[in-house]
Amino acid sequence: MKIATYNVNGIRSRLPNLLEWLEREAPDIACLQELKAADQGFPIGAINDAGYGALWAGQASWNGVAILAKGVDPVESRRGLPGDAKDTQSRYLEAMAHGVLIGCLYLPNGNPWPGPKFDYKLAWFERFLRHAQRLLDTGQPVVLAGDYNVVPTDEDIYDPKHWRRDALLQPESRDAYARLLAQGWTDALRERHPDERIYTFWDYFRQHWPRDRGLRIDHLLLAPALAGKLKDANVDRWVRDRPKASDHAPVWIELAAGAGRRSPAKKSVAKKAPAKKAPARKAVKAPAEKRSARKPAKSTPGRRLS
């Protein structure tokens, strides 16, 4: 079974690249982040035509997550993290597909640091930690996949000294990620590549992709029920080299056959609207996360302010 995560950085503008990747790599499950489209703007027709069922939580211009499943319709179990009823940002979606419980997340970026966006990042991370522990306690085969916006160690970035004031490298961000692993989750990519500098994101700024000046911020974490079934993990770098590419490349894992439990997912892959949402609430106080503009401040080379 192949499970992937891919920050598309705008699903409408990257749709050709997404469809090419789905056809060529054929993941059984794909988690998408930064859709940057309202629910009605999600290209479900094209996704269905590619052979995938989908659930999505959109948001106009910002955020947005989706779970795609090959040949089946994923069964939603949660939309949004518990713990803050006022937070309406579309950052977390959870569903069962092919016998595996998938948590798809887009963790807040947190820049500029320090400030309210970083405070929101840490608060969101704490809620995520609590929910992750509850998932572990169930003993289910769970994968938490997405853009974590955390560079776990200095080995996960081309040159940490230029990013010391970025939210992705702050001690609080790294500590939260370390506490997540301490719960019992396995960082799949690092498990398969313990000593390799392997990246998942290359900024558009200053030719970072041609120079391979990357960061590892997209992660797939495995519950103990799946950790022993990990066969391989890697990054589809070729996608980052396509015209009009996202600044992220897809990251994937391969699990041994029989890794998942019997799934209740239906084999229809029918075109459908996203699952019903709660009535609209007042705008969340949390600051919006903008990641389209990547140019750093002059005083801090390489720093993303979004």
Put a short name on every predicted segment:
Residues 1-49, 63-65, 261-272, 276-306:
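N-terminal, active-site-proximal structural segment of metallo-dependent hydrolase catalytic domains
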Residues 1-10, 99-114, 145:
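Active-site-proximal beta-strand elements of phosphoester/diester hydrolases
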Residues 3-7, 22-40, 102, 131-154, ...:
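Active-site beta-strand/loop signature of hydrolases that rely on acidic residues for catalysis
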Residues 35-38, 42-112:
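Structured beta-strand-rich core segments of catalytic domains in phosphoester-bond hydrolases
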Residues 11-13, 37-40, 113, 151-152, ...:
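Active-site environment of divalent metal-dependent phosphoester hydrolases
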Residues 24, 39-41, 77-84, 153-271, ...:
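Metal-dependent phosphoester-hydrolase catalytic domains
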Residues 82-83, 108-125, 161-166:
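Surface-exposed cleft-lining segments at the edges of enzyme active sites
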Residues 10, 14, 87, 120-127, ...:
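Soluble or luminal CAZymes and related metallo-dependent hydrolases
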